[in-house]
Amino acid sequence: EISACLVGSEMCIRDRDELVNQQLAKMLFANPQRIDYYDRYQEIIDAYNAEQNRATIEKTFMDLMELASSLDMEQQRYVREGFSSDEELSVYDLLFSENLTKQEIETIKKVSVDLLTKIKQQIAKLDHWTDKQETKAIVDNLIRNTLWQELPNSYDVSDIQTYQKKIYEYVYMRYPEVA
């Protein structure tokens, strides 16, 4: 397959580029925390555009293959982490912070699932929730209250406010209508 692609390498790289780009767009929409994959993709494309000799083309193709493989693995990460959906993993990624204990990580996983469930249930009750200040405030308060009640004590006031904002922005972009 690689050798066949190398003969028509320009076309093959363009095809692979298009597939990776589409996959990245879906993944970033589902989980904005995956931006590092997009950054890696841009590095590969920039290197390819800088110099197009045969060695660069071969390296670019191999880099794109490797990136595509890691994207496939990332798309299955929610299963490895014990979640039932990529959405739950997205909330977890937004709440995750370095230096958490194993127990705190388990708590964050539970909070992620619980918070997403509560948000979806609340949004389902609200008519065009993103259109009115009152309904936006209901969702924002739900996020704030859940984080205050359920996050580990290692999260301070500043952390909770930061995570509240991140989760709200994610929900606002991801669930403009009934979830």
State each model region's role.
Residues 1-8, 12:
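Single conserved hydrophobic/aromatic residue that forms the stacking wall/gate
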